[in-house]
Amino acid sequence: MKVVMSTKVDLASMNIKEKLVENFGFSETDALFDGNPVFRRGDVLLLTTNEEMIYYDNLDAAIETQLGIKPELIVFASRHASKAKMPALTTHVTGNWGKAMYGGKDRSLAIAHPTAMKLALLKLNELNDLGWTVCYEATHHGPSELNVPSLFIEIGSSEEEWVNDRAGEILAETIVHVLENAGKKHEFKPALGIGGGHYAPKQTKRALEGELAFGHILPKYAQPVDEAMLTKAIERTLGGVEVIYVDWKGTKGEMRRKARDLAEKLDLEFIRD
């Protein structure tokens, strides 16, 4: 079973949930999760919680305890907030390169699913008739303590966008597409992304135009990290990675060297851009 996670305290999340139920035939079951009705469509459960999802460590265990199923993939339907209030449709995996400021644990990463993230990015881009930005975000915030792959797909970046009906429709269709296709074979090259700003412009461009599929992305502002964290990012990627990709100008000198050395050590392709 796969899970779409929503929360009552997030306007974008409720917008997306509403569109999933209205447009994609998710129907209410007798089951409850965190006291809220569980909706189902085939092998996908649509769950709702009552608090911020970024603090929901061990969600997979809670699902197993309450519903008796171990999810194979969790998609969080969420808002994105930023001071710039840039209208955006984004996807990313969660975790903390250093100190945990917003959920999760210090130096802990959730399990990335590069195929699901790339499928999300491509579908968001295809459906985007709003003229908004479509991009990856760097790995950030919680939850980090999940033992199954997960990703956030988000509407940003202010209340005006969170409640936009078309944005909700795009996110709902994207989520269904991801869940239907993430388990199939694709000719993608999974990559660890290093460098650049929070919205990972170079990684986004590479993924939209070519075969690279990013899991964890380490932005410049979170650098430097040690080799152990880079190795953890690879280990916490479903199936591992084939490529270490570096946004050269957007990466500090010592991280360039660490990335190149690690690629050599692990016999991975190294791309500097």
UniProtKB/Swiss-Prot annotation:
E.C. number(s) listed in UniProt: 3.1.1.96
Catalytic activity reported: a D-aminoacyl-tRNA + H2O = a tRNA + a D-alpha-amino acid + H(+); glycyl-tRNA(Ala) + H2O = tRNA(Ala) + glycine + H(+)
Regions that span the bilayer: none
Domain of life: Archaea
GO biological process, one term: D-amino acid catabolic process
SUPFAM superfamilies: AF0625-like (SSF142535)
GO molecular function, one term: D-aminoacyl-tRNA deacylase activity
Swiss-Prot/TrEMBL keywords: Hydrolase, Metal-binding, Zinc
Record note on cofactor: Binds 2 Zn(2+) ions per subunit.
Co-factor requirement: Zn(2+)
Enzyme class: hydrolase
Subunit structure and binding partners: Monomer.
NCBIfam families reported for this sequence: PRK03995.1-6 (NF003074)
Record family assignment: Belongs to the DtdA deacylase family.
Function: D-aminoacyl-tRNA deacylase with broad substrate specificity. By recycling D-aminoacyl-tRNA to D-amino acids and free tRNA molecules, this enzyme counteracts the toxicity associated with the formation of D-aminoacyl-tRNA entities in vivo.
Protein name: D-aminoacyl-tRNA deacylase
